[in-house]
Amino acid sequence: IVGIAGATGLLLTGFGIKDSVSGIVEKQYSEIYLYDTIVSLKDNEVSDGAREILDGDSFDGWMTVMKKSTDLMAGDASYSGYVLVPENAEDLGTYINLRDRKTGESVEFTEGSVLVTEKPAGLLGVDVGGTITIENESGRRVDFTVTGIVENYVYHYLYISPELYESEMNEPFEPSEIDAVCVETNGEAREAIAAQLQEQEGVATAGFTEDT
C-alpha cells in the first residue's frame, strides 16, 4: 500500500477526507476493490494453465477485463484516465464496489451501462445523462452517455459494458487483466501462487494489491 500511495498521491481524490494518503488508498483497496489479486496479460488471452489455477481451491472467483489508458473528454476539458471493460457486465459489481459515495447505494451496471468515477465527473462537469468522449484506436471520437457515477479514490475510470463498447468503438474486447479473489491468507502460500501464475503462458505479471 505504501508503494501505491507514493506513486498515486497526486491522483487521489480528497472530497474533504482528512485521512492520510495511505488511509485513502487503503479505503480504495479494502472497500472499493473487492479483489486482491491482479494478473496482467501479454497476449490478450487467458491460457489454460492460468485458468486451472484461478479455478482452483486457492481462489474464490475472478473476472477478465480490458483496461486501456485514454483521455476522458467533455466540452473543452480533458483528463487522463482509463477505460475499463469487463468481459461480462454482471461481473463488475462483484469485484468492484459500485456505489454512490454520498448515499452508499449501489449503482447498477448492466448491458448498455456507462459509469464514471466521481472525481473525473466533477472535473469534467458531467452528471448522469451527460456525455463523455473517448477516442478509438483509429482516432475517431466516440460519445458515451453516463448512466451512473461511482465512488473511487485512485485514478480516473470510465466503466463501459462490453456490448456497448464493441458496438460503439468498433473494436473487439481484448482482455488485458484478470482481477481475482485469493482465499489463501498465509504469506508464503500467496507468494507461491503468484509465482505459479507468473510461470503460465501469456502472463506478464501476477501479484497482490497489498504488495503493490
Residue ranges and their predicted role:
Residues 27-31, 36, 47, 51-61, ...:
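Short beta-strand boundary microenvironments
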Residues 6-35:
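Alpha-helical transmembrane segments
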Residues 32-33, 108, 149-188:
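Small-residue transmembrane helix packing/gating motifs
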Residues 6, 35-45, 68-70, 180-184:
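Conserved short loop/turn motifs at secondary-structure junctions
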Residues 179-182, 187, 191-212:
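A cross-kingdom feature of multi-pass membrane systems that activates on extracytoplasmic/periplasmic
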Residues 1-2:
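Alpha-helical transmembrane segments of integral membrane proteins
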